[in-house]
Swiss-Prot record:
CDD domains: AdoMet_MTases. InterPro entries: rRNA_ssu_MeTfrase_G, SAM-dependent_MTases_sf. Keywords: Cytoplasm, Methyltransferase, rRNA processing, S-adenosyl-L-methionine, Transferase. It is found in: Cytoplasm. S-adenosyl-L-methionine binds at G73, F78, V124, E125, R137. NCBIfam families: rsmG_gidB (TIGR00138). Its EC number is 2.1.1.-. The gene is rsmG. Belongs to the methyltransferase superfamily. RNA methyltransferase RsmG family. This is Ribosomal RNA small subunit methyltransferase G. Its main location: cytoplasm. Specifically methylates the N7 position of a guanine in 16S rRNA. It is an enzyme of class 2 (transferase). GO terms for cellular component: cytosol.
Length: 211
């Protein structure tokens, strides 16, 4: 799977975005030899399993200029770095408690010249700030995740959709989401035809500001 996969689903990519996504693969392959943040199997399918998967969030919600997005448990930078490439006028804060993963985030961001990415090597519960949307990729079950990010949603809505969580998940979520009646599930197979996305979803959960 190559860069053509991204062009297929995002035909409006600018030359600068295409250049960054191209360089992204080189940077991750290089850094993954030093610090294993992506499995050996997945690194060969980086565009499909990590980059395009991250961009599934964009199919559900794009971010307006000036918005602030928090990526919780970012690992080596997913979904935050691909989202930051797509939204150069939005601010992305990427947090992870594991220092070596944040090292990769910093090096990749610097290598791409991404000025809209800030990293934090700490637990999300210790992070101060309010965000329009909080994104992540299956780092915990929803009740735990909601507890982690409580109090981090911005008061004002700058998008048509209310501020909240955009969570990349997979499988049967009926039990996990039974207490969240306002949650909405978007099937990524509705947007991407590859088999990998058959069970993949974006869960949107609106959240209220708690001052």
């Amino acid at each position: 799977m190559t860069l053509e996969l991204l062009k297929k689903y995002f035909p409006a990519l600018t030359d600068d975005q295409i250049s960054k996504f191209e360089k992204l693969e080189e940077l991750y392959k290089d850094w993954n030899l030093k610090i294993n943040v992506v499995s050996r199997k997945d690194i060969d399918e980086l565009y499909l399993r990590h980059i395009l998967h991250s961009l599934g969030i964009v199919k559900v919600q794009s971010f307006n200029p000036g918005s602030k997005i928090l990526d919780v448990g970012t690992g080596g930078g997913f979904p935050g770095i691909p989202l930051a490439i797509m939204h150069p006028e939005s601010a992305f804060h990427l947090v992870d408690s594991i220092g070596k993963k944040i090292k990769v985030v910093d090096e990749v961001s610097e290598g791409l010249g991404l000025e809209n990415v800030t990293s934090f090597n700490q637990r999300v519960e210790e992070l101060n700030g309010n965000y329009d949307f909080i994104v992540s990729r299956a780092v915990a079950v929803m009740p735990t995740f909601v507890r982690w990010v409580k109090g981090k949603i911005a008061k004002e809505n700058v998008h048509e959709r209310k501020n909240g969580i955009l969570y990349l998940k997979g499988g049967d979520l009926s039990d996990e989401l039974k207490d969240y009646r306002t949650a909405k599930i978007f099937e990524l197979s509705d947007y991407f035809e590859e088999d990998f996305f058959q069970t993949k979803k974006v869960v949107y959960l609106p959240m209220k500001y708690k001052g």
